Amino acid sequence: MVRLAPAEGLISVDDHVIEPPTVWVDRAARADRDRVPHVVEEDGVSVWRYGDKRITLPSLFAQAGRDEADIMPGLMSYSDMRPAYFDAAARTEDMDTDGIVASLCFPTIPRYCGQTFLEAKDRELALECVKAYNDWTIDEWAGGAPGRFIPLIITPLWDPALAAAEVERCAGRGAKAVSFSENPAKLGLPSLHHRAGYWDPLLSTINDTGLPICIHFGSSSMVPTTADDAPIFVSALLSPLNLTYAAADWLFSRKLERFPNLKICLSEGGIGWMPYIIERAEYVVEHMRWARTFEPFDYDNTRYENLGPAVPPSDLFRRHIYGCFIDDRFGVENLDAIGADHVMMESDYPHGDGTFPNSLANAERLLAGVDAGARHQIMQGNARRVFRLEEPQWASSKTS
C-alpha cells in the first residue's frame, strides 16, 4: 500500500457507497425500525426492505478488487462484499492503493438522487429517511475519514421547499454537494422549464449556499435503449448521453441566468460530446430566432415571451457546467474546445466501469500530453475549487 502526498494523487468526483445495513435502523425510533430501510437475509442474499420495496444488490454494482473472469451477474450478501464497499476506514485503504486522495460518493439504496424515497407512499417517513442518510454521509462516512470524502446529500424532491430546507440544514453541517436528477420530468415531477418555477425554492437555496449540483446518469430512472429486444450493450453505450439532455435543459431553462452561482457537474457522462453540444447550441439559437418569442408550435403572434437565453449558450456552458470522465481520450484531445478548468475525473469505485486499482495510472496515461498546469486542474485543482475543499491534513508517508 502506498500513501501519497495530497498533491500527488487524484480526486474522484464520482464513486459509490453501498450503505451499511444499520444506516436507517440506527437513526429510527424503535417503532419505525421495521418501516425504514433495513436488511434481511434471504437464501444467502442481503435484501433491503422498505415499504413495498424489495431491493437486492446485484454483484455487477460492486466489482472492485475482483478478477474479470470471476464477474458474473448475481446477487450479493454483505458477507460476500469487500469491506471497502460500505466501510469508510476500509475504503480509504483502497483509495490509498488507487492513488485517490478524496472521493465523492453517490448513494446506492436511496438511488442516485433519492428516487427510492420519492416513490414512497409515506412522505413523512421518507423525509426522515432522507435526513438520516444525509446525517450518516456527513457524520459517519465523511466524518470517519476527515478530508477524504466529499459529502453529497440527497433531498426530498417531492417538495422543493422541504428540499431547500434540507440543503440549508446540511450545508451548515458540512455538506459539499447536492445530488439532483438528470431529468425530473421522467420521475413524474415538473421539469426545469416549469413556468411557475417549481424548482426555484431549491435552486435559490443551492445558489445561496454555493453547493455544486451533481447529476449522475441514470438519475431519471430511465435506461435509454432503442428497442425492447436491444442488447444491453446498446443501453451501456447510450446511458451517458442522458447527460447531453440534461445539459440542454440547463442551458435553455433560464435557471443559470437567474441563479448565477449554480455549478452543474455531470457525472459519468464523459466530455468528448461537449464541443459539439456547445457549437450546436449556438447554431440553434442563431438559426431559430423565431423560437425566442413564440410558444413552441404556437404561431399566434399576439403571445410574446422571450424563451431564448439572454446569454450565449457557449458562455453559460463554460460558466456553469462541468464534465466528469473516467476514460475519454477524444475529450482530452479536445480540451481547448471545452476548457481544462471545467473538467474533472472519476474512478467510479466500485462499479464495473471503474479503474481500481489503477485510477492514478489511468489518469496519468490519459493526461500525458497535457501541460502540467492543466493536468493538475483536471486531477484535483478543479474539484478543490468547485467543492471548496481544504488541503487534507493527513501526512504523506509511503509504505510497502
Residue ranges with predicted function:
Residues 125-126, 142, 147-150, 155, ...:
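Catalytic pocket-lining loop regions of alpha/beta-barrel enzymes
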Residues 1-11, 19-74, 79-97, 101-102, ...:
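Mid-to-C-terminal alpha-helical segments outside catalytic/metal-binding sites
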Residues 105-119, 144-148, 163:
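Substrate-binding cleft and catalytic face of glycoside hydrolase catalytic domains
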Residues 117-122, 228-238, 359-364:
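Short glycine/proline- and charge-enriched loop/turn segments
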Residues 70-76, 111-125, 161:
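Surface-exposed, active-site-proximal loop segments in enzymatic domains
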Residues 11-18, 213-218:
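Histidine-centered catalytic micro-motifs
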Residues 13, 19, 106, 181:
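Conserved residues at the C-terminal ends of beta-strands
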Residues 106-111, 217-222, 349-352:
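Short glycine-enriched loops at secondary-structure junctions
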